[in-house]
Amino acid sequence: MNYLEGTIDFAGQLRCQKYMNYGLCTSAVISYIYGYLVQDSYCVIKLFLILASLVALVCLPAWSMYNKNPLKFQKKKE
């Protein structure tokens, strides 16, 4: 499978969107709590960027887990 091609099915798109939404919200909450505990806003930004990069690593490439239910097209009628 070519990872740069970006072929994922509709169920994979939904799964990827859920991972992205939950991952970014969780990253924001963790970053905020950590920044509150250390009383440093720079740490909030730095930790959020690190965690958002990890979420991007999970969501952006076309992993095979996002293409488990490919569409089956009908054959061309002649």
Curated annotation (Swiss-Prot):
Report the protein name in the record: Signal peptidase complex subunit 1
**Pfam family of the protein (one):** SPC12
- Location(s) in or outside the cell: Endoplasmic reticulum membrane
Chain ranges sitting on the Lumenal side read: 39-42
Q: Which GO terms describe its biological process?
A: protein targeting to ER; signal peptide processing
Subunit: Component of the signal peptidase complex (SPC) composed of a catalytic subunit sec11 and three accessory subunits spc1, spc2 and spc3. The complex induces a local thinning of the ER membrane which is used to measure the length of the signal peptide (SP) h-region of protein substrates. This ensures the selectivity of the complex towards h-regions shorter than 18-20 amino acids. SPC associates with the translocon complex.
Q: Report disulfide bridges, numbered on this chain.
A: none
What is the topology of this protein in the membrane according to its UniProt annotation?
Multi-pass membrane protein
Mind giving the lineage of the organism this protein is from?
Eukaryota, Fungi, Dikarya, Ascomycota, Taphrinomycotina
Task: Give the transmembrane region(s).
Answer: 19-38, 43-63
Report the family membership.
Answer: Belongs to the SPCS1 family.
| Topology Cytoplasmic: residue spans | 1-18, 64-78
Predominantly, its location class is endoplasmic reticulum
Keyword Ribonucleoprotein among record annotations = no
Alphabetized, the UniProt keywords read: Endoplasmic reticulum, Membrane, Transmembrane, Transmembrane helix
